[in-house]
Regions:
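Mid/C-terminal beta-alpha module of Rossmann-like enzyme folds, strongest
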Residues: 2, 197-253
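A conserved pocket-lining segment of Rossmann-fold NAD(P)-dependent short-chain dehydrogenase/reductase
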Residues: 168-191, 195
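Conserved beta-loop-beta element that borders a ligand/cofactor-binding pocket
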Residues: 134-158
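C-terminal amphipathic/interface module of NAD(P)-dependent oxidoreductases
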Residues: 254-288
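Conserved Rossmann-fold NAD(P)-dependent oxidoreductase catalytic core, especially the SDR/UDP-sugar
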Residues: 84-126
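NAD(P)-cofactor binding segment of oxidoreductase domains
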Residues: 58-100
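Glycine/proline-rich active-site loop of Rossmann-fold NAD(P)-dependent oxidoreductases
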Residues: 131, 155-167, 202-213, 219
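N-terminal Rossmann NAD(P)H-binding glycine-rich loop of SDR-like oxidoreductase domains
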Residues: 3-23
Length: 288
């Protein structure tokens, strides 16, 4: 297949592109500028994803699409609505696959109740627009678009993603310190980018229309344990960070990173034969 991947230079998009190419597919990857790096074999396409006409033109020459791009700012919801709307219109009546990157944050706090694809929505403010976008994809099945919604946990791998930034050692008057929001007792549900890329490739190839999959490891990571791994490596101490103070730097993201989540990817493993095999988050952090 010839597959359009939005955000091909990003953490998720580049992993999806590598997985698709590794399975024999051709990838057209959107980038924001010609000098943005993309995986070997990707056909880069400079495109303004806020422009529906550009998306319609890009979709005309492909057999499937995967949307992973994000503006990572206050326009993220607008971008998703634009991309999803344009690609649904372009693919209507064709049966072509369109995989959308949602997220596990959509489900909010789980506590000790294991989140599945059927768990209710309770998103933090930063992704409060996502239920409406997911509804567009759900409804598009009736228009003969093979939509697939993938909800990844917190993505890591190769030193990329939010985790290395969040837990990066800082210096104060007493030396190096690794800070986590509040007491760090909450759990992150996580997934390596390369494992996630394989999930997307499998889903694009064979997932039924309207499918939803959680893309995460079944064992969550306690945030303070992750912080301790980084601290030990850098001879630093671990410190609680008052969420109110942290909001000066991380704004609405603090609420999301404070979520306590446990989840299962049993559905993806059973239906698609997905088998995550990359190092876990703690192993990754110890190696950085």
């Amino acid at each position: 297949m010839r597959v359009l991947v939005t955000g091909a230079s990003g953490t998720i998009g580049s992993a999806v592109a590598r997985a698709l190419i590794g399975r024999g597919h051709t990838v057209v990857g959107t980038v924001t500028a010609a000098d943005r790096p993309v995986p070997a074999g990707v056909e880069p396409l400079v495109a303004d994803l806020f422009d529906p006409a550009a998306l319609t033109a890009a979709a005309a020459s492909v057999d499937a699409a995967v949307h992973t791009a994000s503006s990572n700012d206050e326009r993220a919801g607008e971008l998703d609505h634009t991309v999803v709307g344009a690609l649904i219109e372009a693919f209507a009546g064709t049966g072509k696959a369109f995989a959308y990157t949602s997220g596990l944050w959509l489900h909010g706090n789980s506590g000790d109740t294991v989140t599945t694809e059927e768990s209710p929505f309770d998103p933090p403010l930063v992704v409060s627009w996502r239920p409406a976008v997911e509804k567009l994809l759900e409804d598009a099945v009736a228009r003969e678009v093979r939509t697939i919604r993938i909800r990844p946990g917190l993505v890591y791998g190769g030193g990329r993603g939010y985790v290395p930034m969040l837990l990066s050692p800082q210096n104060d008057d007493d030396g190096a310190v690794v800070r986590h929001f509040a007491d760090g007792s909450n759990r992150w549900s996580v997934i390596h980018a390369d494992d996630l890329g394989e999930l997307y490739a499998l889903a694009v190839e064979s997932a039924p229309a309207g499918s939803v999959y959680l893309g995460t490891l079944d064992e969550s990571v306690r945030v303070k344990a992750a912080a301790q791994v980084v601290a030990d490596k850098h001879d630093a101490r671990v410190q609680d960070w008052d969420p109110t103070d942290a909001q000066q730097y991380w704004s609405v993201m603090v609420e999301a990173f404070l979520l306590d989540q446990v989840a299962t990817s049993a559905k993806a493993r059973k239906e698609l034969g997905w088998t995550p095999s990359q190092p876990g988050l703690l192993e990754e952090l110890a190696a950085l």
